[in-house]
Amino acid sequence: MAENVIDQIQAELRNSALQLYPNAGELRNVRIVGHTPKTDHFIYDVCIDFANGSERVAAKVYRSSKCGQQGVRAIAKTENENLGYAYSVFEKKDLAGIPRPLGDFSTFGAVVSEKISGLPLQSIIMKAALLPGFADHGGLVASARKAGEWLRSFHKATADMPEPFDPEVLLSDLESLCVNCRGEGLDDAAIRTILTGARHLLSRGKRALPSSAVLNDFTPLNVIVCESGVGITDYARMARRGPSFGDVAMFMASVEALEKYPFCNRSITGQVQDAFLEAYGANSSEQAILRVLKMRVLLSMFARGRNVKESAVRKKVMWANVMKRFIQQAAQRSMSPAA
């Protein structure tokens, strides 16, 4: 099915290429140069050749096997609208890092845009963890800082009225998550540390927090580092309005969760989080709230991980044990009142 869809996308791009790139000269070819299979979609790498050069295009084609053709059309339509909205906002403010959409391909269950060429920030973090001295050249910290600056720009460009913040609701969420994780071995001492630390941190927090468009999937895997800065290519889960700090907490938790790999230590993830948070510009009161929000995301990761269907029971048990130790360490480090 995906092969038929990409053929149709290819044909559409042949018809629209000269309108999309009026100064590129004569159209020579539109070719597929590679593809990457994902769980629910394919990413096709498309090259449009002109007399004066070439343009790279990313075509995201959703699989219809899970939710049917109508389902993938609806998903693609939502993502295409999100991408168009985000791109128009950034274009008006002369900001970069959001790919230009090249038309509405949602009837094919696809999203097509210019390609942002670069390396995922997570790959850079892993390289720094595996190669001694790699992080000493400043590239890792600079990339994390760029990610923080980009997210701050995104939230400022789409800012809305602040939302009321109720610490008791957040504490209730944490308590529920702790109960869910207790069955997998999260001990009472770690739970006490989490809840006591959270209550202490939230006692000095704000009563209103910023809101804006939120990506809901701002992770180091989705942050593409390129020569001119960073870019984000996935807008499937974006919402036009939501709590801005949710994106910040998601990023920091995703970075910290990489410590579950034995070769990725705290010195690496700490550098990334510190540089990112400094560039984002959160003050001390906001950072206290973010520490609690980050712990909520980490606990959610632990709870989700134990529900994943796994063919090998041993792998599932190993995941639970690794995450249990990691959550206990993270709680002691981040949630203790003295932290």
Model-inferred region functions:
Residues M1-P37, A51-S54, V308-A339:
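Regulatory N- and C-terminal appendages and interdomain linkers associated
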